[in-house]
Design a protein with these regions (language model features):
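Metal- or metallocofactor-binding catalytic centers and their adjacent structured scaffolds
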Residues: 37-114
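Structured beta-strand/loop patches that form or line metal/cofactor-binding pockets in enzymes
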Residues: 1-55
Length: 114
């Protein structure tokens, strides 16, 4: 089963009440949704919530890096999760938020066919 299509969607979720840290107030969760579709139309979903002050990633950086990762993963075996990780790690250091969204989506595909 090969990866046929990958889509990324920015999703901003307003919080009912902003939370405040020493770094300032946060009024919304700025997430990225990843949808991976295999060549048999099995779909896996993943999501990440990057937070600049914790991991150095933002919704915008995740979208940019995610597009590069998506291009590289097209045609890859959707069930070879370790191989997908190795490919992403060879492409770019760190960026674990967006990589985790891809990981979750690949695991979701595996769960869908189990």
């Amino acid at each position: 089963m090969k990866i046929a299509r990958i889509e990324l969607f920015p999703l901003s979720i307003p919080l009912k009440t902003p939370f405040i840290t020493s770094l300032g107030a946060v009024a919304a969760a700025e997430n990225v949704i990843v949808r991976i579709t295999a060549d048999d139309d099995t779909v896996g979903w993943g999501e990440c919530n990057p937070f600049w002050s914790i991991n150095g990633e933002t919704q915008e950086t995740c979208m940019v890096v995610g597009k590069h990762l998506a291009r590289a993963l097209i045609g890859h075996d959707a069930l070879d999760i370790a191989g997908g990780h190795a490919l992403m790690d060879r492409m770019i250091f760190g960026n674990n938020s967006i990589k985790s969204a891809f990981d979750i989506a690949l695991h979701d595909i595996g769960a869908e066919i189990a």
